[in-house]
A protein has these predicted regions:
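Amidase signature
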Residues: 1-82, 247-443, 450, 478, ...
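Short glycine/serine-rich loop segments
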Residues: 121-252, 449-462, 467-470
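Gly/Ser-rich catalytic/binding loops embedded in alpha/beta enzyme cores
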Residues: 2-194, 304, 309, 398, ...
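Short glycine-/acidic-enriched loop or helix-start segments at secondary-structure transitions
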Residues: 103-104, 146-148, 199, 290-291, ...
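Short, well-ordered beta-strand elements within core beta-sheets of diverse protein domains
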Residues: 25-32, 112-117, 229-236, 376-381, ...
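Short, electropositive alpha-helical surface patch
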Residues: 468-481
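Short, hinge-like loop/turn segments at secondary-structure boundaries
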Residues: 154-157, 204-208, 337-340, 429-430, ...
Length: 506
């Protein structure tokens, strides 16, 4: 057993250096035996001890002694010539919506008297992270059932922003984004139904990617109808993002809609020339989406970076339309039908249990009511509603397919507001416009979700209050590598992540 008696919250200088390394640098150092897995684990646990109490990003952390013993076992494997993969010896905390064998999956809800038993097996993408050599140290905090883009729940409490601890971290991958930004994890997994791999990275000045649907197979109870929630990576560098995506990605016959395309070696294919490309900037969709003052102005400063990369920016303020898709007018109703149908159905068992229903936050009740009794004055969702929504979504795809015949990329802000007061459940208004639901303020992310195309968050800087913002860039379906290459070129031009560290890091 490793001696932990000398462990202390304050990290030494070598530990400070270890947590600052990019994940690929860390991987190389471990492989070359320049640093031991025990040293790495100790450095990250020190960082967590020092910073996590201030942000509440990592939850259900395993005991230090147990984790150091697991790290020692990884060192012994290396000594015997066995290296499991590029994440060998990495501390890794999994988003608390995904199963990890031996850990409860609380989803921000299951607590006494509704305890979640330890999972019996890993989720499919988590299997792959384990096979790559990672050590699971705990979970990253989420919003209840992943609903809403503010990470707060009644099990572990609220996760706050890496750059301002009075502000929201975003959600539902808020814990993951904050942990990566504050160097408490080398990289993190997340998931995205409605912006959760875009908004939290945007608000914490890191990279996040929602891959093409099917790129990362999900081992859900339903593997056919659920085509909106996807898993993906969060990282501080494009190379790290690519490496984690290629670890998580790839076909699996347990997930029949997963993409039969080898993710190959994304991390070694990141250099690309974007000269001659063009991007359609949708902005606020021609004034349709309310935006907090300063959001558009900050995002539009990124036009200069696109230009430096040889990418022409074209203002294209309206959504394209098609036979059954009326653009802006259809966007929110279309999203709501799918959201109520899928989330309300997933929560139906809780809906039927009066005691559990009484413990739910308003976000979940809204989705359940939207399906079964109606919400916002709308009637309950019917099978015909879902069919008609699928027709509209098909038409939307055809409209964007034509748009992508004219443009290489499409871009929008990653959020309509800057990170808000962490004590609020959600923004009630944006620039004087009342929000009709807990998630209407996130509507800017609906396009990427409904299309199922790959989307990446790229940092674009900070407002006068020091709050980060990002833009989401959408590529044609299955062109995930293009976005990773763009992220690499972007970081080389801007250096936002590397040059603008959270003040908590010192």
């Amino acid at each position: 057993m490793v001696d932990t008696t000398a462990a202390a919250p304050a990290a030494d200088h070598r530990s400070d250096r270890i947590v600052e390394w990019d994940a690929v640098e860390l991987s190389d150092a471990i492989a070359q035996r320049a640093v031991s897995c025990v040293e790495v684990m100790g450095a990250y646990l020190d960082q967590i001890d020092r910073l996590n109490p201030q942000v509440n990003a990592i939850v259900n952390l395993r005991p230090r002694a147990d984790l150091l013993d697991q790290a020692l076992a990884k060192d012994q494997e290396l000594a015997a010539g066995e290296r499991r993969g590029w994440m060998h010896g990495f501390p890794h905390a999994v988003k608390d919506l995904a199963n990890v064998a031996g850990f409860p999956t609380t989803q921000g809800f299951f607590r006494p008297p509704f305890n979640a038993p330890p999972a019996s097996r890993d989720a499919l993408a988590i299997e792959r992270i384990r096979a790559a050599g990672a050590i699971f140290i705990g979970k990253t905090n989420v919003s209840e059932f992943g609903l809403g883009s503010h990470t707060y729940n009644n099990v572990f409490g609220t996760t706050v922003n890496a750059y301002d601890q009075t502000r929201s971290a975003g959600g539902s991958s808020g814990g993951a984004a904050v942990a990566v930004a504050l160097r408490m994890l080398p990289v993190a997994d997340g998931s995205d139904f409605f912006g959760s791999l875009r908004n939290p990275p945007g608000w914490n000045n890191v990279l996040g990617m929602r891959p093409s649907f099917g790129r990362v197979p999900g081992l859900n109870t339903d593997v056919f109808l659920q085509q909106f929630g996807v898993e993906g990576p969060i990282a501080r560098s494009a190379t790290d993002l690519a490496m984690l995506l290629q670890t998580m990605a790839g076909y699996d016959d347990r997930a029949p809609l997963s993409i039969e395309q080898d993710p190959g070696s994304y991390g070694q294919q990141l250099e690309a020339d974007f000269a001659g490309g063009n991007v359609a900037w949708l902005g606020d969709l021609g004034g349709y989406l309310p935006m907090e003052p300063g959001v558009l102005e900050l995002c539009e400063r990124s036009f200069e970076t696109f230009t430096e990369l040889g990418i022409e920016v074209t203002d294209h303020p309206r959504l394209p339309t098609a036979t059954s898709f009326a653009g802006n007018a259809d966007l929110w109703p279309l999203f709501l039908i799918y959201r109520h149908w899928l989330m309300g159905s997933q929560l139906a068992t809780i809906h039927r249990n009066p005691t559990m229903r009484a413990a739910l936050k308003p976000e979940a009740i809204y989705e359940i009511d939207g399906l079964f009794t109606g919400a916002d004055g709308n009637p309950p969702i019917t099978a015909l509603d879902v069919y008609n929504a699928s027709v509209k979504r098909t038409s939307m795809h055809q409209a964007f397919r034509k748009l992508f015949s004219r443009f290489s990329l499409v871009a929008l802000p990653s959020a309509q507001v800057f990170a808000f007061d962490a004590h609020l459940p959600w923004p009630a208004t944006i620039d004087g416009v009342a929000m009709s639901s807990y998630h209407r303020w996130m509507e800017v992310t609906a396009i990427g979700t409904l299309l199922g195309y790959p989307v990446i968050n790229l940092p674009v800087g900070f407002n006068d209050a020091g709050l980060p913002m990002g833009i989401q860039v959408i590529a044609p379906n299955h062109q995930d590598l293009t976005l990773l290459q763009l992220a690499r070129a972007w970081e080389q031009r801007t250096g936002w992540v590397q040059r603008h560290r959270p003040a908590l890091l010192g």
